[in-house]
Amino acid sequence: MALTRLLIKDFRNIEAADLALAPGFNFLVGANGSGKTSVLEAVYTLGHGRAFRSLQAGRVIRHDQPEFILHGRIDGAEREISVGLSKSRQGDSKVRIDGSDGHKVAELAQLLPMQLITPEGFTLLNGGPKFRRAFLDWGCFHNEPGFFTAWSNLKRLLKQRNAALRQVSRYAQIRAWDQELIPLAERISEWRAAYSDAIAADITATCAQFLPEFALSFSFQRGWDKESDYGELLERQFERDRALTYTAVGPHKADFRIRADGTPVEDLLSRGQLKLLMCALRLAQGEFLTRQSGRRCLYLIDDFASELDTGRRRLLADRLKATQAQVFVSAVSAEQVTDMAGEKGKMFRVEQGKIEVQPQD
């Protein structure tokens, strides 16, 4: 999968842009605040229905405009696919695929699997469990056809159960929610556990190349005691949940812990090493998807040079080239991305929201 064309209208500081994209590397070079990250964010939004720097649609729509519009053409395995997304200041979204409306954002995500690497991405390693659950859920979404529906139903049931906890006095009054919740929770936990086991070898191999000085280990924690039956646990902890007014255990509390030499990575690794580990996780996940399904991710890398010395930048560049995937990279100067340049690459100069193709030597 690769985007061959990207049209942007009234997104961030970009009034209008029509970009013919390279199947390999697409470099976005410009000063801070020029709009290069906005291009990355437009690509991300086209595949996710939301931006990665803001969850509010109004903040990514250009000043005084009613909506943003994004359109892309995807070079699929068998044919070219047209996709589009628009969103108004009121939050109304419209998803279009091959000229027809009424589609879901999840369909865009299936068509455009992406891995995002940003300076804020350290939260995958030093943030709360929700960021690592999202890592596992990305893999389950792209590998298990029933995952998204089950995950959506789980969120709905947990919300309903938590609301009911504020109103009920006996467990029998909440049993109906649990009878639906329990099989969903167990199924999602099984999918996550299977995915974490399956991808462990890929992560270990990639980390050995990026951080050979550490012995890294990975463990999936499902969100409740592994020796306990989830249904019995919910009933046993009813009074505690009622006092808290939320469900304290379950797949919504799962985690994927990473240790280096037996120590949590966030307590041992430098920022440069954490960035390499984050890149290793994203690369391993993308390569696992390719091996399982034949589909390639798009890799979006914002501020490529931050936290990485020349040797580490070259290592990351070589691994990205080996994926043969489409890559979008932002940098302050062209010199920072010279190790990535090649015959399948294209360089764009971004200044004050204007984007121009730059010739490569």
Swiss-Prot record:
KW Signal (keyword) present: no
GO BP terms, alphabetized: DNA replication; DNA synthesis involved in DNA repair; double-strand break repair; SOS response
Organism for this UniProt entry: Serratia proteamaculans (strain 568)
Protein name as annotated: DNA replication and repair protein RecF
Binding site for ATP: G30, A31, N32, G33, S34, G35, K36, T37
Transmembrane portions of the chain: none
One Pfam entry name: SMC_N
Subcellular compartments: Cytoplasm
Stated family: Belongs to the RecF family.
Source organism superkingdom: Bacteria
Gene Ontology terms: cellular component: cytoplasm
Single Gene Ontology MF annotation: single-stranded DNA binding
UniProt-listed PANTHER family: DNA REPLICATION AND REPAIR PROTEIN RECF
Signal peptide, first to last residue: none
Known function: The RecF protein is involved in DNA metabolism; it is required for DNA replication and normal SOS inducibility. RecF binds preferentially to single-stranded, linear DNA. It also seems to bind ATP.
Key word Heme present: no
The entry's keywords: ATP-binding, Cytoplasm, DNA damage, DNA repair, DNA replication, DNA-binding, Nucleotide-binding, SOS response
